[in-house]
Amino acid sequence: MTDLILWRHGQTDYNLQGRIQGRVDIPLNDTGREQARRAADCIAALGPTRIVSSPLLRARATAEVLASPTGLSVEIVPELAEKSFGQWEGLKAADIEKQWPDHYATWRAGGDLPQFGIEGRRQTAQRVGEALRAIAADAGKDDVIVAVSHGAATNLGATHLLGMDPQQWFGLRGMSNCCYALMRTNKRPP
């Protein structure tokens, strides 16, 4: 069996302010660095054999905290980057809802809004999910892989791995900053 640990990055100032980050390359704040240190202690105890990360700074910095105690290097996987939120990046949800109430309602219901440059849910789910599937497929029988990514990317990627419709199902709710989830492959025949 292969363990795949999906780990969301630590807190940033945008998280603290309730701003949508998307592809904006925001660093961890002091709280985020402390969250990463504490979570890394727990994850290191699970015996990781490989660390992969989104190229965005907040994910890379979180992954690097785990690299030190494990002696592993961090491999950058571009497909693990956060979903693009287009024109809404840097804005607060309340401001978006006020300025575009109908579009906001569509987005909250799982609809896509390409007119704002927002990456579609299915597109994100497939991009991240297929990257995670390929990473797990390349793993050895007893490998423990840590994949450091982002809230929407992780949720949608997990939805894809589980074969669920990302337009109808909203993934791992409540995966706060620096929380992680364990998925286990089962490569044995049925």
Question: What would you call each of these model-derived segments?
Answer:
Residues 44-47, 135-144:
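Glycine-rich phosphate-binding loop signature in dinucleotide/nucleotide-binding domains
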Residues 5-7, 11-72:
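Active-site-proximal alpha-helix that buttresses catalytic centers in soluble enzyme cores
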Residues 68-127:
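Phosphate-handling substructures
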Residues 4, 143-151:
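Generic beta-sheet signal
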Residues 53-54, 126, 148-149:
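Short beta-strand scaffold positions
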Residues 164-189:
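Domain-level recognition of soluble alpha/beta enzyme cores
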Residues 29, 33, 56, 97, ...:
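Amphipathic, non-transmembrane alpha-helical scaffold segments
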Residues 12, 153-154:
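Short active-site segment of divalent metal-dependent hydrolases/proteases
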